[in-house]
Every structure is written in structure tokens, then in C-alpha cells.
């Protein structure tokens, strides 16, 4: 059974009053909901709260879900909007996130250290980008959504997504170029 059909089956169980079905749906999508929210908010607790808000909004809106559509696209649009709303309310703060802690942790091997350093550099670069740029990069590269899927999630045309993604890549490359200096000759 493909993933969307599994989601549809769970939704049908929810609509019939099966309380465990909602738990199953949350379990299936909580990691990605958190990831999308975290990429926009860059704050663990606020991302968790935005993801929870999105699940609550989705639960209320399930009766309006068009089962011919892909559930994940519909749901991640809700997560995206919940995170953007939280971002508007967010106060600028400097916190030590898991990613910062990860960058300072002791690594077992040189290879792991290099991998963690690259990850931390990319995280630091992403922090400097706009939430829109981070969303485009996250959805396309990390979550491997197609341009059409991103267009559905964000309610923006796929041509505009292509342009936004191109510009986001350029801005990320420029931030990395500044961060890494002589280590990087040509990122883009």
C-alpha cells in the first residue's frame, strides 16, 4: 500500500471515531512536521509548538480534506503556515540549539568531525537566510519534494518556486562563501 493510501485509511478511521487512528497519523508525520517548523523557526520548543498547532488544525480540517489529493502536501501546507505564524510572533533571542551543541560535542573520528562541522556550517548559514529561503532549500534538498509538490505546499506557482529556489541557493552559496572564506572557491 502506498503512503498516501495508508494516510487515507487512517483518516477514514479518524472520521469513524477511532481515537488511536489520530495517534497513528501524528506518529507517521511528527518528524517531518517538526523539521519543517524548525527550519523556519530555528527554535526547538517553538517548532514543537508549531507542529502541535498544525496537527490540531489538521484534525479540525480533516472533514474538508479532499481524498484525491496527497495528504502530506495538504498537511505540510498547514505546518508551513503554522510555523510562519509562529515566526511572526517570535521574539529575537539567542539560544543554544541542539545544532549548536552538536557543533561543540566531541567526535569519535575525524570523518565524523568533518561531517558534523559541515553540518554545523550549513546550519549557521541557514540561520542567516530568510524563512522563505530556508523553506525552499529544506523542502527541495532535505525533504526531496518536487517543484510541483513545493508549489502545492506553499500555494505558489512552480515557476515562482523555481526562481525562489534558484535565488535561495545563490544566497546560501554567498553566506557559505563568506563563512568559509578561502576554503571555498566556487560554490555556485
Question: Where are the regions that the model predicts?
Answer:
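Sigma70-family region 2
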Residues: 15-16, 42-43, 53-70, 89-91
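Arg/Lys-rich amphipathic alpha helix in sigma70-family domain 2
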Residues: 63-67, 77-97, 115
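C-terminal edge and immediately downstream basic/flexible tail or linker adjoining helix-turn-helix-like DNA-binding
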Residues: 2-3, 13, 121-127, 152-155, ...
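Acidic, proline/glycine-rich intrinsically disordered inter-domain spacer in sigma factors
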Residues: 100-127
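DNA-recognition helix of helix-turn-helix
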Residues: 84, 133, 142, 148, ...
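Short helix-capping/turn signature of helix-turn-helix
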Residues: 28-31, 39-40, 138-145
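Structural recognition of an alpha-helix C-terminal capping motif at a helix-to-coil junction
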Residues: 35, 49-56, 69-81
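Short, charged helix-capping/linker segments at alpha-helix termini
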Residues: 15-23, 35-53, 158, 178-183, ...
Amino acid at each position: 500500500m502506498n503512503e498516501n493510501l495508508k494516510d487515507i485509511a487512517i483518516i477514514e478511521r479518524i472520521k469513524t471515531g477511532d481515537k488511536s487512528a489520530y495517534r497513528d497519523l501524528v506518529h507517521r508525520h511528527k518528524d517531518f512536521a517538526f523539521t519543517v517548523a524548525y527550519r523556519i523557526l530555528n527554535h526547538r520548543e517553538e517548532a514543537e509548538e508549531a507542529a502541535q498547532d498544525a496537527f490540531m488544525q489538521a484534525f479540525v480540517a480533516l472533514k474538508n480534506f479532499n481524498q484525491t489529493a496527497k495528504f502530506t502536501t495538504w498537511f505540510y501546507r498547514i505546518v508551513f503556515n503554522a510555523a510562519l505564524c509562529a515566526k511572526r510572533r517570535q521574539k529575537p533571542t539567542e539560544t543554544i540549539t541542539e545544532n549548536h551543541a552538536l557543533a561543540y560535542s566531541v567526535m569519535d573520528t575525524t570523518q565524523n568531525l568533518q561531517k558534523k562541522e559541515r553540518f554545523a556550517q550549513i546550519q549557521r548559514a541557514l540561520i542567516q537566510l530568510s524563512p522563505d529561503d530556508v523553506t525552499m532549500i529544506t523542502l527541495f534538498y532535505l525533504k526531496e519534494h518536487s517543484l510541483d509538490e513545493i508549489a502545492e505546499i506553499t500555494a505558489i506557482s512552480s515557476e515562482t518556486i523555481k526562481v525562489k529556489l534558484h535565488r535561495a541557493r545563490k544566497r546560501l552559496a554567498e553566506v557559505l562563501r563568506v563563512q568559509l572564506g578561502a576554503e571555498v572557491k566556487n560554490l555556485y
